[in-house]
């Protein structure tokens, strides 16, 4: 009998509309069918995914299951390790920009199977003021909206919740920010 590989799933029980802890057994079965012995660890507060992955024992695969924020925390924690782990992501949040980048839909079980049937790829990690990010970074007028929009509104209205928050600031003046950045060794500065 072939030895099972080890997998830790770090999941955010408060992400989006679709993650239900009652389905974790189903996800575990999918992982086992793909040769993984899985352990599930739920996050309890902001920053917890970062703490969890940074203190994990060596394993074959870590899966972040949550929104963009959960994945960003997991990436940040993984970067703090000397022995980085193979990290994957299953999107379960409200917007799931990272999930869209990876080509995922809304069906968690299908996404999990796609991930486990796929191949490991490296991806770029960018850093702004010491803070890693993997998909997009922004600054300026509307950047507070994802953080200010209440979880209750997001669960009730989905994307529309962000629009509701954005309308509140739409007519306020726009401030330009001086920004310096470096890409491939070339530094640029300007007001944006």
Language-model-detected regions and their locations in the chain:
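Nuclease catalytic cores that cleave nucleic-acid phosphodiester bonds
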Residues: 62-63, 79
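ATP/NTP phosphate-donor binding region
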Residues: 1-62, 110
């Amino acid at each position: 009998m072939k030895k099972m590989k080890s997998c830790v799933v770090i999941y955010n029980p408060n992400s989006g509309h679709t993650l239900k802890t009652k389905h974790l057994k189903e996800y575990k079965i999918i992982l086992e069918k793909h040769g993984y012995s899985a352990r599930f660890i739920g996050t309890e507060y902001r920053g917890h995914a970062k703490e969890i992955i940074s203190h994990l024992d060596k394993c074959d695969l870590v899966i972040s299951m949550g929104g963009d924020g959960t994945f960003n925390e997991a990436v940040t924690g993984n970067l703090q390790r000397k022995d980085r782990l193979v990290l994957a992501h299953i999107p379960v949040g409200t917007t799931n920009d990272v999930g869209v980048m990876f080509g995922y839909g809304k069906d968690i079980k299908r996404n999990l199977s796609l991930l486990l049937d796929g191949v490991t790829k490296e991806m770029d990690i960018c850093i702004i003021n010491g803070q890693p990010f993997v998909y997009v970074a922004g600054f300026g007028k509307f950047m507070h909206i994802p953080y200010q929009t209440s979880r209750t509104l997001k669960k009730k209205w989905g994307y529309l919740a962000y629009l509701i928050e954005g309308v509140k600031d739409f007519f306020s003046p726009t401030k330009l920010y001086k920004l310096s950045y470096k890409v491939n060794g070339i530094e640029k500065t300007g007001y944006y």
